[in-house]
Amino acid sequence: MKKMPVLFVGHGSPMNVLEEENPFNQNFRRITQNFPKPKAILMISAHWYSSRLQVTSGEQPEMIYDFYGFPEDLSQVQYPAPGSPELAEQVRSLLQPENIELNPTRGFDHGAWAVLKFLYPNADIPVVQLSLNRLQPAQWHFNLAKKLATLREQGVLIIGSGNIVHNLRAISWEHINQIGAGYDWAYAFRDHINQAMTTQNNDELVHYEQFGENAALSVPTPDHYLPLLYVMALREPDEKVAFFNDHLIAGSLSMTSVLVG
């Protein structure tokens, strides 16, 4: 079996789900036409940011509507993909000696279903989510991700879902739907990170704070940035990156997405 690629997706606002024909969602649909259908998906979402390492192990995870102040239609969205207790157990085994908890009741958060709905709209591929341990530094996450590499050879698509630039306090709501609306500091940080990915400078990706104020404004908390490190950690030395949805919206949100492999 050909090794599966790895994918980072900028998920942006939950409202994207209700705008089925927006260009970001159209590109999500297109990108999965470039490689074989996976046997299963391992999702690392910014929206499962916990004090311990966990993995979903239920057979039919429920939907989690982890947002407030949005239209009721958004809380009616369904993505009834099955879980995979077998993959969950395999992930737990691969990540040893880290203590990882199987969570049979945790469902899919919007960092997962809001993009999977367009990547694989039939919801017929088993999905497992891995949490982000908020108590650990970036280097720990990068090193942990490397332990998942063998899954790529077994037909598992590993997806990181977050945003390289994600500052909700700085959002310009009047530009929420305007592609190309970004603050100077957001563009500068996005460009630094894109260049580090292009040249495979993993040290700069892990130690992103070296980019000073641009980094502090773009990544005020690491939750939305960390999923990118899981994807980049799984990149082989000879693998190229392909950018898509590489735009800023609302001043301080980047939709930049990257296919590896």
Specify the residue positions occupied by each region the protein language model found:
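Surface-exposed, charge/polar-rich loops and edge strands
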Residues: S93, P97, I125-P126, R134-Q136, ...
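Short glycine-enriched loops at secondary-structure junctions
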Residues: A46-S50, Q60-P61, F108-L116, I164
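Flexible, glycine/proline-enriched loop segments at strand-loop-helix junctions
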Residues: L74-P82, P104, S131-A138, A215
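Long, well-ordered alpha-helical scaffolding segments within enzyme catalytic domains
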Residues: P23-N34, Q139-Q154
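Beta-strand elements within well-structured catalytic alpha/beta cores of enzymes
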Residues: P5-V9, A40-S45, L130, L151-I164, ...
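A short aromatic-anchored loop/beta-hairpin motif
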Residues: K2-E98
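Internal, conserved structured core segments that host functional sites
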Residues: A88-F142, K147
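Conserved phosphate-coordination/catalytic loops
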Residues: E19-P23, P82, A138-F142, V219-P222
